[in-house]
Design a protein with these regions (language model features):
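Juxtamembrane boundary at the C-terminal end of a transmembrane helix
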Residues: 227-235
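Transmembrane alpha-helical segments of integral membrane proteins
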Residues: 41-44, 169, 192-208
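Transmembrane alpha-helix boundary signature
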Residues: 3-20, 39-48, 78, 82-83, ...
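Alpha-helical transmembrane segments
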Residues: 19-33, 95-117, 181-184
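Juxtamembrane inter-helical linkers in multi-pass membrane proteins
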Residues: 122-145
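Juxtamembrane/interfacial segments at transmembrane-helix boundaries in multi-pass membrane proteins
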Residues: 14-18, 73-103
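Mid-bilayer segments of alpha-helical transmembrane spans in multi-pass integral membrane proteins
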Residues: 4-8, 24-42, 63-79
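Interfacial loop-to-transmembrane junctions
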Residues: 198-225
Length: 235
């Protein structure tokens, strides 16, 4: 239920959030954290050593990637003057030229974090088929397995839409109209399609990382987020 809740707050066809009460940036980040927590707990609950290892890796990825996403979005929030996702999206839509550098660096940091959050190569450590065979999902089957796989797929879509909706809001409606709604739906689908194609291109051009190297690579994403923060202070 967490991912559908997050999805209702994301700007998809409009610049404003459809559900403003859930549109606060901090709320959305911690809803993602709750989803990861229960996914890890689902793996630990079976008692299998393979699911336990997969769950611990999932938790470790959360520790590494969530600060990147939070800091990158926080920089965008500071540029917008609000932590509400509607204000952030509207600011990016009108693109303040004087704050271009912090926004571009924040975009790079959030793109890095989005790629990791989607569990694509080389960061699919929790479900590495050659090592753990589905990781936290090893002991699941039937309806339970289907629900968990559906949740993972939905999370990938929601994370990608959050990134695309906030940092590439062009084509989304600022004022409602029937023609604008139709155009916005088409543009939203095209943006998601382009995002999936770019991610697939990156995923198929890289090999899986060794587990111990993950933290070294994620420092690059945090570096982008930190540079965005520094450039915001200097700007």
């Amino acid at each position: 239920g967490v991912m559908p809740t997050v999805a209702t707050a994301l700007p998809v066809v409009t610049v404003a959030s459809p559900l403003p009460v859930l549109g606060d940036l901090i709320t959305l980040i911690y809803l993602f954290a709750i989803a990861r927590f229960f996914f890890a707990i689902a793996g630990l609950d079976t008692g299998s050593p393979f699911t336990g290892i997969g769950a611990s890796r999932e938790a470790m990825l959360g520790v590494l990637v969530e600060p990147i996403l939070l800091l990158g979005l926080w920089v965008a929030a500071q540029v917008a003057g609000s932590t509400h996702i509607s204000f952030i999206t509207d600011t990016v839509y009108h693109w303040p030229v004087a704050r271009s550098l912090p926004l571009v660096l924040a975009l790079c940091a959030c793109a890095f974090a989005t790629f990791i959050e989607m569990g694509k190569l080389p960061f699919d450590l929790a479900e590495a088929e050659q090592e753990l065979q589905e990781g936290p999902l090893t002991e699941y089957s039937g309806y339970g397995f289907a629900v968990l796989k559906w949740g993972i797929s939905l999370k990938q879509l929601v994370v990608l839409q959050m990134f695309v909706g906030v940092f590439f809001p062009w084509g989304q409606m600022t004022h409602f109209s029937a023609g604008g709604l139709l155009l916005a739906v088409v543009v939203a689908a095209l943006k998601l399609l382009v995002g999936v194609l770019v991610i697939a291109l990156f995923e198929n051009s890289m090999a899986r990382l060794r587990f111990v190297e993950t933290s070294r690579i994620t420092w690059a994403g945090f570096g982008f987020a930190f540079l965005a923060f520094v450039s915001l202070l200097v700007a």
